[in-house]
């Protein structure tokens, strides 16, 4: 893939999922690398962003989302919220980091989770919605992203959602900031 695998393979966390949904959400976001700022409203803003995304997905599916699969699910933060807040019955995900998949399985042991590259997503088992939230910028090139998008399309019964597709002209600046 690229050098990001070195970063993600080092991520570990013990998640106390006995707390509130919001507290678990914050811990999962931290495990995914959103731990660089600790200012008032930081995690609340991410939660509101998720709520908006979830409402748009629901509206686009006529309020009937029974299954959702996430490419690049990381620690499972989105899947966790779709399970607990939106009560989506069948969830699945795939991520490149074995440590993040381990965290996700610890919080959601009955979820279909796999450690693999995005391009290897199984398209035989369909889901209503297939989501890729802020992962396309980690792909090596446009051709890889196009191939992943095709697999997402083939896997989805109702909707494909891709968030945060970054401006290629600012890729170097963005990667430097994230490191």
Features from the language model and the residues they span:
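A short, conserved alpha-helix within the catalytic core of class I
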Residues: 139-151
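Class I S-adenosylmethionine-dependent transferase superfamily signal
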Residues: 82, 151-152
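Glycine-rich S-adenosyl-L-methionine
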Residues: 156
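Class I (Rossmann-like) S-adenosyl-L-methionine-dependent methyltransferase catalytic domain
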Residues: 1-123, 160-179
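A conserved beta-strand element that flanks and buttresses the S-adenosyl-L-methionine
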Residues: 131
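Short catalytic micro-motifs in class I SAM-dependent methyltransferases
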Residues: 134-138
């Amino acid at each position: 893939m690229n050098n990001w695998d070195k970063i993600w393979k080092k991520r570990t966390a013990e998640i106390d999922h006995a707390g509130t949904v919001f507290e678990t959400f914050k811990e999962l976001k931290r495990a995914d690398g959103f731990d660089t700022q600790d200012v008032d409203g930081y995690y609340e803003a991410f939660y509101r962003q998720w709520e908006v995304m979830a409402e748009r997905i629901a509206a686009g599916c006529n309020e009937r989302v029974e299954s959702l699969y996430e490419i690049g699910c990381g620690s499972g933060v989105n899947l966790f919220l779709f399970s607990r807040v939106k009560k989506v019955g069948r969830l699945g995900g795939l991520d490149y980091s074995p440590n993040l998949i381990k965290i996700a399985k610890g919080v959601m042991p009955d979820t279909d989770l796999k450690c693999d590259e995005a391009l290897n997503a199984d398209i035989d088992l369909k889901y209503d919605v297939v989501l890729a939230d802020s992962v396309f910028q980690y792909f090596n090139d446009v051709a890889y992203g196009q191939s992943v998008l095709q697999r997402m399309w083939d896997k989805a019964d109702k909707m494909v959602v891709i968030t945060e597709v970054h401006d290629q002209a600012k890729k170097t600046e963005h990667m430097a900031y994230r490191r």
